[in-house]
Amino acid sequence: TFYEGKVPGFLHLYVGEEAVASGVCLNLNKDDYVISTHRGHGHFIAKGSDIKKIAAEIMGKETGLCHGRGGSMHMIDIDNGLYGSTGIVGGGFPPAVGLALAAKKNNSNQVSVCFCGDGSINEGSFHEAINLAAIWDLPLIIVCENNLYAQSAPQEYHQKVKDISERAKGYGVRGITVGGMDIFEVYSATKDAVDRARRGEGPTLVECKTYLFSGHYVGDSKAY
């Protein structure tokens, strides 16, 4: 379909990372908040969004989640707690913190989950977000889908630490690393993080080490 020219723009597939979205979203209620990424199709499916509307949106059709105007990278489905995916690297952290703050102020027992990639951890928005979440003990779970490459750059090119979860320590935040290819590991780690958040014990950074079976996007030469 993509190569037939039926999908406008870029297409970032989630093939290989399904255990992360599934393991995380199995712990969430319908009204819990999720902020997604440019590679968000799996998050939307796992959170309960209509797969036909997702497909329609990817193809730019009026019957899509955003009436075909958002496309593959910019979808939203508030009825299912999905407050947007974004093509901006690190762009999901600020709204995820805002949603977590709203949940705390409203005593709603909701949690806010922010999916992100390994490359986005170097963005200033990550550090600002996790710092505020720690100071205010917000019900925020940052799920870092570490597929070992920030587009074409391997992790050792842009981060000294072996486990990204270690970076949470500098903010007094609990960090944990799990095998992102194992749905049971992801589920267990996320359950603990969600339970802590609902008890008012603050944020958690969950790093899921996974691997992307395709290139960064459809048509990627994968020269790296």
Feature-to-residue mapping (PLM):
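Short, well-ordered secondary-structure micro-motifs
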Residues: 47, 125, 152-155, 187-189, ...
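Flexible, glycine/charged-enriched surface loops at secondary-structure junctions
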Residues: 1, 112, 201-205
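Short acidic (Asp/Glu) and glycine-rich catalytic loops that position anionic groups and cofactors
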Residues: 2, 31-36, 145-146, 167-174, ...
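Ligand/cofactor pocket segment of small-molecule handling proteins
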Residues: 135-138, 145-203
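Structured core elements
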Residues: 12, 35, 141-143, 177, ...
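Cofactor-binding active-site loop characterized by glycine-rich and histidine/acidic residues
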Residues: 6-136, 154-160, 165, 170-172
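Short gly/pro/ser/thr-enriched loop/turn and capping motifs at secondary-structure boundaries
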Residues: 42, 148-151, 212-214
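Glycine/aspartate-rich loop-and-adjacent alpha/beta segment that forms the canonical ThDP
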Residues: 196-224
